[in-house]
UniProtKB/Swiss-Prot annotation:
Protein name, per record: Dipeptidase 1
Organism: Bos taurus (Bovine)
Catalytic activity: an L-aminoacyl-L-amino acid + H2O = 2 an L-alpha-amino acid; leukotriene D4 + H2O = leukotriene E4 + glycine; L-cystine-bis-glycine + 2 H2O = L-cystine + 2 glycine; a beta-lactam + H2O = a substituted beta-amino acid
Free-text activity regulation comment from the record: Inhibited by L-penicillamine. Inhibited by cilastatin.
Gene Ontology BP, a term: homocysteine metabolic process
Lipidated positions per record (GPI-anchor amidated serine): S384
Length: 410
C-alpha cells in the first residue's frame, strides 16, 4: 500500500509526459497556425524596423515573446503577422505606417529564407508545412489602415494582406469598436455603415478574411450576417468565461457556428481570467467553452504574443504551445479536434474565403461620403469635380452639357 503511495507522483509525471509526447507527435505533422503575433510592432518600437541591426537578429532576439528558436520549439508552422499601426495614426499617416509594417514582414522572409516563407494563400501554408518553414502571412490590424478607401483596401490585398481587422480599439467612420460596448466610445455606425457594408463585400470579392477581433457586438453581428464567407476572430476569447468586452458573447458564438467561422483564442491575462494573473489551464477553459458552444470546428489559437504585457503562467512565449496542446489532450480532446484547433480549422476557413472570392466581378467604386471623413489632414480631390451616381437624371444631363460645352463639343 505504501509502495503504491510513493509511486503516485511518478505515475502522474509519466502521464503528463505522455500527453506532452503525444502533443509533440501531433504537432510534428500538424503544426500550429497562430492568428495574431505583434513581433513586427516590436521591431518598429525597438529598432525602427532596421533588421540589419545586430540587436534585431531574430535567431537571438531577447526580451520578446517571439524569436526563431522559440517558434521552432513551439512548432509554429504558420503565423499571421500583424501589420499594426495605432489608432492615433487615423486620418494622418495610417496608410504609410501600414505599408512600412507590411514591408518589414516581407523583409523578415527575405532575411531568413531558411525559416520564413511569405505566402498569400492556403496552398502556400501547406507548402511551408512540407518545407518545414513558418508560413508568414500579413494581417492588417485595424480598419483605419485603409483610410476609408476601397482602393487602398485593394492595394493592400495586392501587397499580401490576407485579413483585415475591421477596427482596432477605435471607431472608423464605417465600423464600431468594442469600447462602444463599455460606454467609453459612442456608436457611429450602429455596427456597419453603408460604406462598411461595401468594405465587407469588397473583402469577400477579393478573398480577404474578415477579422472581428476588437469590434463591437453590433459590428460582429452585422459582418457575420452580411459576409458570404466565414470570418475569424484572430485574437479573442469567450465572454462567458471572462466577461471582458473584447471577448465573444454566446449569441455571437452561435452565429460563428452557423457560418462555419472561427474564434482564435487570445492569451492576454485580462481576457483570459479578467485579472492580472492567469494560467495555462484557464486558457484551456476558453478553448473548452468555445468548443462546447460553437463546436470543435470553431476553435483556434491567436496568442497575441508580443502585443500584450501579461501572459498566463505556462504560456510565457511562443515555445509553450506544446504544453497547451498537452492540456487539451489531458482534457480528452480527440486527435481530430486538436488537429482542427492547430491548423485545419483555419485552413478550412481560408479555403472557403478563397472559394467565395470573385475577381471577375466588378470592384466596388462608390467612395465614402466626404462628410463622414475628418477633413483636417486630407484633400477632397474627386469629391468636388466628379458627378455623383446619386444625381437625378436631369441634373446629370445638365452637368454633361456643361462639360461638353467647355470642351467645344456642342
Amino acid at each position: 500500500m505504501w509502495t503504491g503511495w510513493w509511486l503516485w507522483p511518478l505515475v502522474a509525471v509519466c502521464t503528463a509526459d505522455q500527453f506532452r509526447d503525444n502533443a509533440v507527435r501531433l504537432m510534428q505533422s500538424t503544426p500550429v497556425i497562430d492568428g495574431h503575433n505583434d513581433l513586427p510592432w516590436q521591431l518598429l518600437k525597438r529598432f525602427n524596423n532596421q533588421l540589419q541591426d545586430p540587436r534585431a537578429n531574430l535567431t537571438s532576439l531577447n526580451g520578446t515573446h517571439t524569436n526563431i528558436p522559440k517558434l521552432k520549439a513551439g512548432f509554429v508552422g504558420a503565423q499571421f503577422w500583424s501589420a499594426y499601426t495605432p489608432c492615433d495614426t487615423q486620418n494622418k499617416d495610417s496608410v504609410k505606417r501600414t505599408l512600412e509594417q507590411i514591408d518589414v514582414i516581407q523583409r523578415m522572409c527575405q532575411l531568413y529564407p531558411e525559416t520564413f516563407l511569405c505566402v498569400t494563400d492556403s496552398a502556400g501554408i501547406q507548402q511551408a508545412f512540407q518545407e518545414g518553414k513558418v508560413a508568414s502571412l500579413v494581417g492588417v490590424e485595424g480598419g483605419h489602415s485603409i483610410d476609408s478607401s476601397l482602393g487602398v483596401l485593394r492595394a493592400l490585398y495586392h501587397l499580401g494582406m490576407r485579413y483585415l481587422t475591421l477596427t482596432h480599439s477605435c471607431n472608423t467612420p464605417w465600423a464600431d469598436n468594442w469600447l462602444v460596448d463599455t460606454g467609453e466610445d459612442e456608436a457611429q455606425s450602429q455596427g456597419l455603415s453603408s460604406f462598411g457594408q461595401s468594405v465587407v463585400k469588397e473583402m469577400n470579392r477579393l478573398g480577404v478574411i474578415i477579422d472581428l477581433a476588437h469590434v463591437s457586438v453590433a459590428t460582429m453581428e452585422a459582418a457575420l450576417q452580411l459576409s458570404k464567407a466565414p470570418v475569424i476572430f484572430s485574437h479573442s476569447s469567450a465572454y462567458s468565461v471572462c466577461r471582458h468586452r473584447r471577448n465573444v458573447p454566446d449569441h455571437v458564438l452561435q452565429l460563428v457556428k452557423q457560418t462555419g467561422s472561427l474564434v482564435m483564442v487570445n492569451f492576454y491575462n485580462d481576457y483570459v481570467s479578467c485579472k492580472a494573473e492567469a494560467n495555462l489551464s484557464q486558457v484551456a477553459d476558453h478553448l473548452d467553452y468555445i468548443k462546447k458552444v460553437a463546436g470543435a470546428g470553431a476553435v483556434g489559437f491567436g496568442g497575441d504574443y508580443d502585443g500584450v504585457s501579461r501572459l498566463p503562467s505556462g504560456l510565457e512565449d511562443v515555445s509553450k504551445y506544446p504544453d497547451l496542446v498537452a492540456e487539451l489532450l489531458r482534457r480528452q480532446w480527440t486527435e481530430e479536434e486538436v488537429r482542427g484547433a492547430l491548423a485545419e480549422n483555419l485552413l478550412r476557413v481560408f479555403k472557403a474565403v478563397e472559394q467565395a472570392s470573385d475577381h471577375k466581378q466588378a470592384p466596388g467604386e462608390e467612395p465614402i461620403p466626404l462628410g463622414q471623413l475628418e477633413a483636417s489632414c486630407r484633400t477632397n480631390y474627386g469629391y468636388s469635380g466628379a458627378p455623383s451616381l446619386h444625381l437625378q437624371p436631369g441634373t446629370l444631363l445638365a452637368s454633361l452639357v456643361t462639360l461638353l460645352l467647355s470642351l467645344c463639343l456642342l
